[in-house]
A protein has these predicted regions:
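Extended low-complexity, serine/threonine- and proline-enriched intrinsically disordered segments
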Residues: 21-57, 176-181
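Bacterial Sec-dependent N-terminal signal peptides
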Residues: 1-17
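Short helix-loop boundary/capping segments
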Residues: 164-181
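Residue-level recognition of well-ordered beta-strand positions that form the cores
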Residues: 7-11, 50, 82, 168-170
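Short structural boundary motif marking the start of a folded domain
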Residues: 2-7, 45, 163-165
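Short, low-hydrophobicity acidic/polar segments
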Residues: 48-160
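Residue-level signal for secondary-structure boundary sites
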Residues: 14-16, 89, 175
Length: 181
């Protein structure tokens, strides 16, 4: 049997700290009005494992988020893994592990008819977007699938490829010109 047990874990982080940068997790101001932990992505609902054999043939398996058994072609395979619960992420060219791409749609929710508090909008549609779906990924360029009676365990840590952003504005004057965001 040509099977491997995938054991997946996820880096559920939302902040990539630069060397010497601020450690926001240790010094998060309460005046931000939101907790540091609430910005972290949630555990995904599923895992997609794409295996590509040496001839470039692709096989996809949909598993629970922590993994499971994957059947692969014997010999060398490339593996591309990502969370299987993305609603607004578009995957392209997954038939080739080298050229696979993921992107968000240009607009992911319907426009609304303008800000009712702003007379200048005159009911004109305003382009808005939903926050991007969390996307986690892991890639293994070469994995040798052996014929063994008990599946070998392959640990994979999926890292975030899409992040949340917290944007804060602080005003010293002109607050009377600010509408509801």
């Amino acid at each position: 049997r040509y099977e491997t047990r995938i054991e997946a874990s996820y880096d559920l982080i939302w902040e990539m700290r630069e060397p010497g940068g601020v450690d926001w997790s240790a010094d998060w101001p309460s005046e931000f009005g939101i907790s540091y932990e609430s910005l972290a992505p949630k555990m995904p609902d599923g895992l997609c494992v794409n295996s590509y054999n040496r001839n470039g043939q692709k096989s996809s398996r949909h598993l629970p988020p922590k993994g499971g058994i994957v059947e692969m072609s014997p010999g060398m395979n490339s593996l591309l893994m990502y969370n299987d619960d993305t609603e607004f992420i578009i995957f392209d060219d997954l038939n080739n592990s080298v050229s696979a791409k993921a992107t968000t749609r240009s607009r992911s929710r319907a426009s609304y008819t303008g800000n009712t508090l702003d007379p200048a909008s005159k009911g004109e549609p305003e382009k808005t977007v939903s926050p991007p779906d969390p996307l986690f990924g892991h890639y293994i360029e070469a994995y040798e699938q052996l014929a063994i009676p008990i599946p070998e365990t392959l640990n994979a840590t999926l890292r975030p490829l899409v992040f949340s952003y917290l944007i804060r504005y602080e005003f010293t004057h002109g607050t009377e010109y600010i509408g509801l965001a």
